[in-house]
């Protein structure tokens, strides 16, 4: 698991672009979800989760290929599409 503290990190920039642009989501073939419940359901149903970004370590098992990133709350607030971030968001391959 890695830790990112900069809002200017390339991954954080990528996530902000996913949150703000449908054209970018189509171009990359990725979607962005902001919810612990959605992450649990995606993992349960075998969705291709690519990156999990959270303010606390995710307590449930994820496939080894999933990139797990810890960020401070202020970075989460800057990348989350939600007005009140739930503390975890993830990218996955768009269906």
List each language-model region with its residue ranges:
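Arg/Lys-rich RNA-binding interfaces used to dock onto structured RNA substrates
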Residues: 1-95
